[in-house]
Every structure is written in structure tokens, then in C-alpha cells.
Amino acid sequence: MTETTPKTAPWTVQKRTAVLVLADGTVIEGKGLGATGAVEAEVVFNTALTGYEEILTDPSYAGQIVTFTFPHIGNVGANAEDIEDLTPANRHGAVGAIFKADITAPSNFRAAKDLDSWLKHRGIIALAGIDTRALTALIRERGAQNAVIAHDPNGNFDLDALKARAANWCGLENLDLAKDVTIGQSLVWKELPWTLQDGYGEQDAPQYHVVALDFGVKRNILRLLTGLGAKVTVLPATATAEDVLAHNPDGVFLSNGPGDPAATGEYAVPTIGKLVETGIPLFGICLGHQMLALALGGRTEKMHQGHHGANHPVKDYTTGKVEIVSMNHGFAVDSDSLPENVEETHVSLFDGTNCGLRVVGKPVFSVQHHPEASPGPQDSHYLFRRFINLIRERKGQAPLPEREQAA
């Protein structure tokens, strides 16, 4: 009987070419992928099983390193269709990624390149071959971590310098990143939702006009609005209420985005407060939800570890139904701080944090989660129809069914 030598697991690292250095001095070694260099950021974990390209290009992840809890990332490669940031040339999104297993060759008919090459093109530093379950447990116990991720193919690292960078990084609190990821000038969005038969079509006969304030908007949000008949004009985060009203919109959308919502107080929050008073239908998502709460007199707070994934249960108090939704936020609205004329409409069934609000007597509402998914379940797509119905009501038109009827 011949003894066989145990095979080395494919994710076992032979030589360190990347490190993650936490602010407390902890050093985690692994294999480097993607771009080279070093960058400070906050380390979070995401529990989604699919959609890594959409996750990494979501501008809400600016200033963050995403740890994927699912072990096999990159199996379906990458393409130009699944990105979410509005201006790909500016590469807004996560600055780092952490994987359990090494990236394998892609196997998917839509793959245009392998994930490693795509990460390099996007400027994303990646670390593979580590115990992501242990890192996730650390984040759950200690909270989201300030850190430096570094990649050098030769494995040369000045750990003392990296530890100092991690310890001295300011973190996301009081950090305004919306100005960094917003568009430079206005644009009209016409792309429709993707279908297998036609890919992305182009809108030709809009029925309504929605102005979207871009604090880091995702493409699929804009597609769902155009898919419901809205012409969408996208304005920069710094647009004033007068800028918005000059477009004579039927509705206003407040987008998702990165950073601390309170840090936008000098420009976006006052603008939102003025727009609420106009009576124009208004819908906010994620950062837009948080800034709306601030404009209404509420408060926001930094969360321990945040919510990042595509499997979060949320209850809609307006219907009594429970939805499974996508989430990506590290700040939350303090529901106890909301004034009497603001109702809490949605709540997380994981930890009871606020996930939605509406203003009594006004066509104004928002949610913390991501109803557009991309990636994730489509349980909350009805919220876009709810927004369009507020526009239709103001025009004297009959409402659309909030949920598509089964054939």
C-alpha cells in the first residue's frame, strides 16, 4: 500500500503577497490579487452569495473593504454590463476585497474577463486565502474595523508603517464621501432594465419626469425608474433646491451613497428640507433615507458592524408583510428621534433598527434598504411603483398595482 501525500488546499497560501493590517495592530496575511499598493479603509463583511461585481462597484462602498463570507468568488468572471457606478472611468466603489478561496478561471457565457484582471482594471486591492469566517466573527464581535490593505507581488511590507496608517486613519464618521462619488454635471438617464432577450433597451416615450440627486446612485435604481415610464434627470449631490425645481420635476429621488449622512449637513440636508416643503413626491433610498431623516429633524448614528448582504428580513408596517431585502449601510436612523409627523414604516427583523419612514400628510417616504437589489431579491420592487403612484395621484391618474399581477 503506497502512502499518498495530502494535496494542498487551493486556498492555502504559500507566500504572503498581501496583508490586512487592523487599527489594533492585528496582521492577516494572504495572497494578493487585483491592484497593487496600499489603502486605508473600513473592513465590513457581506453575506450575499452572488453579485460580487455589483457589490464592488456600488458607490456606497467607497472607503470600505468588503469581506465576502461566501467562499467562492469570481467563478462567473466579470463583464461591462453588471457594474453599478454611474461613471466607471472614475472607479467609484469598494477599494478592497477579501476572499476565502483563490480566484479560478471564469465559467459563464457573459464573462468578458477574469475577476483578477477586472480588479486590477478597477484599482481594487484584493486579499485571498484567509479564514474569512474568523475575520467575520471578529467584525461581529468588535465592530467594523479601520484597516490598511496592501498588495506587493514581492511580499515586501513595512508592517510598522502600515500599522501606523491603520491606527491614524480617521474612519467613516464625519466623513463626507458623497461629493467624491457624485457626477460632475447633470445627465438624462434613458437605459431600461436588462432582459435576456434584449439586454438593456433605451426609453423612448416617458410619461413622468423625475430628478434624481446623485449621492452615489446605482444604475439599477435609475433603470427601474425609467422602466416605469419616468424620464430621469440626474443632478450632482451639491445641486440646490432651486436647481432641482428649475427642471419642473413630477418627483424627486434621493439616492444611496457612502460616508456619514451627518457630514452632508452643509449642503444636501438643507436642500432636502426645502424640497419636502414643496409637496412634490419624494423617495429616498439608503443615504437618501438617512439625509431625509436629518432634514425632518431626526438623528443618525454609526452602527456596530452595519448591514451588508442580500438576505436581510424587513417588516413593512404599512402592509404587515415581511420582505427579504438587500442592505448596505453602516449608519442608521434613530427612530426615537423622529418627530411626531413622521411615521416609521419599515424595521429590520435582525436588530430592530429603522428601515423606513414617511411624512404624514405629504407624498414623502424613504427606506434604508435597497429595493432595486442588484444583487438580491426583488421583494421590494413595489416601492418604485409606490413612488410612481404618488406622482400619478398628484396628476389625477389612477394608481398602478404595487405588485405585478401573476399571469
UniProtKB/Swiss-Prot annotation:
Composed of two chains; the small (or glutamine) chain promotes the hydrolysis of glutamine to ammonia, which is used by the large (or ammonia) chain to synthesize carbamoyl phosphate. Tetramer of heterodimers (alpha,beta)4. Residues 209-397 form the Glutamine amidotransferase type-1 domain. The gene is carA. PANTHER family: CARBAMOYL-PHOSPHATE SYNTHASE SMALL CHAIN (PTHR43418:SF7), MULTIFUNCTIONAL TRYPTOPHAN BIOSYNTHESIS PROTEIN-RELATED (PTHR43418). It comes from Brucella abortus (strain 2308). Keywords: Amino-acid biosynthesis, Arginine biosynthesis, ATP-binding, Glutamine amidotransferase, Ligase, Nucleotide-binding, Pyrimidine biosynthesis. This is Carbamoyl phosphate synthase small chain. L-glutamine binds at residues 60, 257, 259, 287, 290, 328, 330-331. Pathway: Amino-acid biosynthesis; L-arginine biosynthesis; carbamoyl phosphate from bicarbonate: step 1/1; Pyrimidine metabolism; UMP biosynthesis via de novo pathway; (S)-dihydroorotate from bicarbonate: step 1/3. GO terms for biological process: 'de novo' pyrimidine nucleobase biosynthetic process; 'de novo' UMP biosynthetic process; glutamine metabolic process; L-arginine biosynthetic process.
